[in-house]
Amino acid sequence: MHLVHRDRNYIYNFWPREGESIAQAWGRLKSMLYSCHDHELSREMIIQKNYARLSDNNRTMLDTSCAGSFMMKNIDFKWDLLERIKRNSED
């Protein structure tokens, strides 16, 4: 239980690294999520925290990518957009 609590805290307190792209940060966060299946954080909470901690440029890029406010979109749209950005960066 202690490890789950520790890993949940890592996920909850996740910060993108300076100069890290959206795709890199999302990939790193997804790795944390995968390693801690019992994190009990909703997808909305995960995205909300991640978005709030992105650089201004990266937040603007997400808003532009969805032709409006990223955070006003539904959760499936937001999750899928981040997945597409990550997948496209791997090509």
Residue ranges: model-predicted function:
Residues 1-91:
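Acidic, serine/threonine/proline- and glycine-enriched intrinsically disordered segments
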